[in-house]
Amino acid sequence: MSVDLGMPVAPPQPLAPRRKTRQVMVGNVPVGGDAPISVQSMTTTVTADINATLQQIAELTAAGCQIVRVAVPSADDAEALPIIAKKSQIPVIADIHFQPKYVFAAIDAGCAAVRVNPGNIKKFDDKVGEIAKAASEAGIPIRIGVNAGSLDKRLLAKYGKATAEALVESALWECSLFEEHGFHDIKISVKHHDPVVMIRAYRMLAERCDYPLHLGVTEAGPAFQGTIKSAVAFGALLAEGIGDTIRVSLSAPPAEEVKVGIQILESLGLRQRGLEIVSCPSCGRAQVDVYTLANRVTAGLEGLDVPLRVAVMGCVVNGPGEAREADLGVASGNGKGQIFVKGKVIKTVPESQIVETLIEEALRIAEEMRAEGVPSGQPSVDVAG
């Protein structure tokens, strides 16, 4: 006799279908449509310092950044744009506030896109026609970047504060102005420091337009706090199929933003996994220094670009099981470590040789994977409990 527990025959898909949107091209990177979700960041240098800015862009590129934004608050910054746009390895977006003249300077400089903030550009609405014409002739998109911290005073007066409704109304109003001039190469962001408000705003926006959406939690905070806020907000939206490009905002070096963004996408299965270090959090059962082992293995394999899962475990309770599930792993205890490859113990080594052995085996497996044509991913680090 069977009992119907009301359970589905098969588990539901964890992610909703991707929201259908228009597609725009930011340089050679497609955003929206069926394009993969891209990861962006923003330089922290003075843009006018061309060498420093290009150096940071190179570091971001190496970290996996696909699109970079640079601030243009002054004439000196605007004058630096042609060289930066030409020499950057990835598409450059000019970030414009206050002065509409810098929008035209950025377009003339060859930037791949321009972000405008309708909340603080002087007489922005009056300039939309000219901006649309210039962007259309250059073949570049415009990001309408609405931010809770610089919302139009009229909307603040209407709603009392930067609500989700206020953010969406601002974005759609500006879109309508561009649409009046036949311009539709638009992507939108509606950023707020509160993930709950931000999630509500993007959900509303997704229901009311088909433009690609740039996800971001503004002023997210220091690295730990900002990572949590962004992971919560992005995870909720991306799981619903909302979002076409992301930027994690952290009070930290920009390359850290990129690493977090990539990790979020990998965690949702939205990007091919790269190197994944799985390590136990350590407890009273641990017979080795798991933290040191995991950090040394991570450092030794930094930059490895194949989807390889390495488990670093500190005891005999979960260690053997986790190590068997990984491509490569170690279960440590009693001054030694059992090295697993594809679930099988291949050797037992002294504790002093664990790191060296894992790195050697990882590099060997990586070479085999490359020879077999396994696609590259992006490096990531995961500490599992």
From Swiss-Prot:
One of its GO terms (molecular function) is 4-hydroxy-3-methylbut-2-enyl-diphosphate synthase activity (flavodoxin). SUPFAM superfamilies: Dihydropteroate synthetase-like, Nitrite and sulphite reductase 4Fe-4S domain-like. GO terms for biological process: isopentenyl diphosphate biosynthetic process, methylerythritol 4-phosphate pathway; terpenoid biosynthetic process. Belongs to the IspG family. Keywords: 4Fe-4S, Iron, Iron-sulfur, Isoprene biosynthesis, Metal-binding, Oxidoreductase. It catalyses: (2E)-4-hydroxy-3-methylbut-2-enyl diphosphate + oxidized [flavodoxin] + H2O + 2 H(+) = 2-C-methyl-D-erythritol 2,4-cyclic diphosphate + reduced [flavodoxin]. The keyword Cell membrane does not apply. Its EC number is 1.17.7.3. Its cofactor is [4Fe-4S] cluster. This is 4-hydroxy-3-methylbut-2-en-1-yl diphosphate synthase (flavodoxin). Pathway: Isoprenoid biosynthesis; isopentenyl diphosphate biosynthesis via DXP pathway; isopentenyl diphosphate from 1-deoxy-D-xylulose 5-phosphate: step 5/6. [4Fe-4S] cluster binds at residues 280, 283, 315, 322. Binds 1 [4Fe-4S] cluster. InterPro entries: Dihydropteroate_synth-like_sf, IspG_bac, IspG_bac-typ, NO2/SO3_Rdtase_4Fe4S_sf. Converts 2C-methyl-D-erythritol 2,4-cyclodiphosphate (ME-2,4cPP) into 1-hydroxy-2-methyl-2-(E)-butenyl 4-diphosphate. Signal peptide: none annotated. PANTHER family: 4-HYDROXY-3-METHYLBUT-2-EN-1-YL DIPHOSPHATE SYNTHASE, 4-HYDROXY-3-METHYLBUT-2-EN-1-YL DIPHOSPHATE SYNTHASE (FERREDOXIN), CHLOROPLASTIC. It is an enzyme of class 1 (oxidoreductase).
